[in-house]
Amino acid sequence: MKEYLSSAADVISAQKTDAEVGLSDAEAASRLEAHGPNKLKEAPKESIIKRFFAQMADPMVIMLLVAAAISAAEGIYTGEGGIADVVIILFVVVINSVLGVVQEGKAEEALAALQEMSAAQSKVIRDGRLETVASTELVVGDIILLEAGDSVPADCRILESASMKVEESALTGESVPVEKHAETLSLAEDTDDIPLGDRKNMCYSGSIVVYGRGRAVVVATGMDTEMGKIADAISQAEEGQTPLQIALDKLSHTLTILVVVISLLVFATGFIKHGAEMLGNFDLILSTFMVAVSLAVAAIPEGLVAVVTIVLAMGVTRMSERHAIVRRLTAVETLGCTQVICSDKTGTLTQNKMTVVRHETENLDAHVRTMALCSDATWDDAEQVAKGEPTEAALVTDAAKLGYTTSDLASSRPRIGEAPFDSSRKMMSVVVRTRSGKVVQHTKGAPDEVLARCTKIMTSDGIIDLTDEARSEILAQNKSMADQALRVMASARRDWGTEAPQSYDPANLEHDMVFVGLSGMIDPVRPEVKGAVAEAHEAGMRTVMITGDHIDTAVAIAVELGIITDRSQAITGAQLDKISDEEFDQRIETIGVYARVQPEHKVRIVDTWRKKGMVTAMTGDGVNDAPSIKRADIGIGMGITGTDVTKGVADMVLADDNFATIISACEEGRRIYDNIRKCIQFLLSSNLAEVISVFIASLVGFTILQPTHLLWINLITDSLPALAMATEKAEPGIMKRKPRNPKDGIFAGGVGFDCLVQGSIIALLTLASYFIGHYFEYGTFDISQVITNPEAGVEGMTMAFLTLSMVEMFHSFNMRSLRGSIFKLTSQNIWLWGSFVMSLILTFVVIETPLSQAFGFAEIGFEEYAMAMLLAASIIPLMELYKAVMRSVQKNKA
């Protein structure tokens, strides 16, 4: 059946539904079970085996596999040794690959959970009730309501259209919105079908309602939609890497190149040192190669990228628990350096619970009737509550108190046409027919805009001409209400006799109207917002209010919240239009409130802040907010009142539409970035210590650690504390710091120098432990015998492994604060303590069980353990001293 060639009644009949009542809940559930959810089929996922082997494409893993192959060759060649190294290396490679697969799976699960949290919703009529359901639960035959800002959730035949326009570029490539209607289409001569773009009585999945509203019946879902039919041609953009992840990838590649160069130098040094002796000496070649591999293993922080990704994912999950749903990982990093927050007023800074508290009219009944008739909110007689957009719900509630319910008004004055609200006119009009047959237009909107289109006024004595004196009085009443932080709406009407207007275009309707009255509503400030604004200010973040409300209302609320101190810091959209770009660039830092703004004003405000180098966040809920949200560094959509389009382009969605949530998210962003820096510094300083130790030992001529030892330390000893750092609470004063510069790299703030100093100290402790271990065994620090007989160095190697493992465990506690003393931290990280204990146990297991033979360790006693513990623990006072020196240096610079 081609629904666009059939009448609406025939389509309703074919789908076995009812245009007014919709499907029953039971029938909808049955159809959902029979035909499946309303979503496109997902691309088949790679098998676990394929993912597993994909992990081995890493250059580091390839190098380890080569080392394993050479060790195996050595075992076969000599008939002894080597095999244990092969087993350990392969075990580590397998574990690394398994962890990689698990981590990818966790990331996919997290993404799926986030997608579910921000899933699109649809308004549907079932059993005669208006309900909101997940778009994936829609079935053929559902009656849905569409309005400006909605993404069309399924293919549907339009039943009613009130000036509805739909943008279908996702299907047709044409960005100009198409005006929709409910009339039956007919084929042109010599044609057998109508192109998709000309089917004006249809709406298709993936298109966007940009104007007006409508009612439609679903005729296709999921893969049966037009979008589903071309699903193979649709490519969904994958989540890109964050700047931090890109930087880490570059760091890994740089380290890999450096390692190859250093390893080649070590190999070349061996040839120079041993000369012709090395040629044909497989053992010598092998030992030199293993030193090179050791350097490679030591230099590459194998778990760094995975750890950082997990830290980000954990942060995103934590943010969602605080009602901030992050849709793009880049937002996590950017939140930590946000400098300007451009916030909408209604619902974000205020509670979005409007209540009419004041009227200015000489005909209250006519005024409240007009307000209710000109609203799309409905009054639920059973629950005695209004449902719909908050402002309209307040007006409908006000009318119901006087006995005018929406159901009674709809039956006595049915709507026959309308000019929907849009942000440029700031008003909407409906045309109704009374029981006596008269056609009356009712208009509501911004007082100044409505008043400008009126020529008469309704008084207690009847309708008279609207004089300049009366206009001035109305504007004074409007200002009086606005000064009390009331949102003011005006009503007007126009009689059309018995004939309906030929056109419902706003230009035809909204002129020569009769002014009826004003209603003042209060939307209370959210109690937590004032403190959040103050906290943002202390954290170096500027709050800017951008609203469509009257400037007096905006100023009153902004002053109450501490956003501005007086009216001189506020301007209107009209005033902004008169300011040149150069002047605005100079004045923007003095402006805290923008009132009566248009969508293009928001884009200009964001662009100007960004040109000044300020990291800017922008909130929004309407479809017209999408351009400014996309332009901002952080686009923030509203989860409750936001349209699908706005949420779709946002980097972050506020599940509770609360400004305070933005500040919480910024704090969380700072905490996450701090913890990532701690992980990076911990892992890089540890790896640098290993490189220095192995390199110095190779120059002297002894082996301090084998590749398998370093792999164990990097993947077990280091990774557990690094992951535990992801749970570290925010340091005291984190929201008293200025935002970080987004251009700062990983090593900004002295991280690179810190890594060098800390790595050098750890390396010295490790080298010292080797000599101490040798002394415990042979009673001398002279290791000349080790150079000629590597077997004599087992005790020193065991001591070096134990000390390096333990010193890195202790060093993880130093990383709880990069500059502050850890003894001044008031919180405890139980996960870090847990990782410390677990790493300690695993280290003892490797040394004190039969595993020690595979690793080539010697038996050591209590004295060695005590000395290793003493050396390892010394890293804490040494780092405390270093931090104190650095704090003093920074203080002197300041």
Task: State each model region's role.
Residues 742-760, 789-799:
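Membrane-water interface at loop-to-transmembrane-helix junctions
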Residues 698-706, 772-795:
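Helix-coil boundary and interhelical linker segments in multi-pass alpha-helical membrane proteins
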Residues 272-277, 767-782, 848-852:
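Membrane-helix interface motif
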Residues 717, 795-812:
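Generic alpha-helical transmembrane segments
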Residues 815:
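A C-terminal functional module that forms or caps the active site or interfaces directly
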Residues 146-148, 773, 805:
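Short N-terminal signal/transit or membrane-insertion segments
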Residues 689-690, 754-766:
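Core segments of transmembrane alpha-helices
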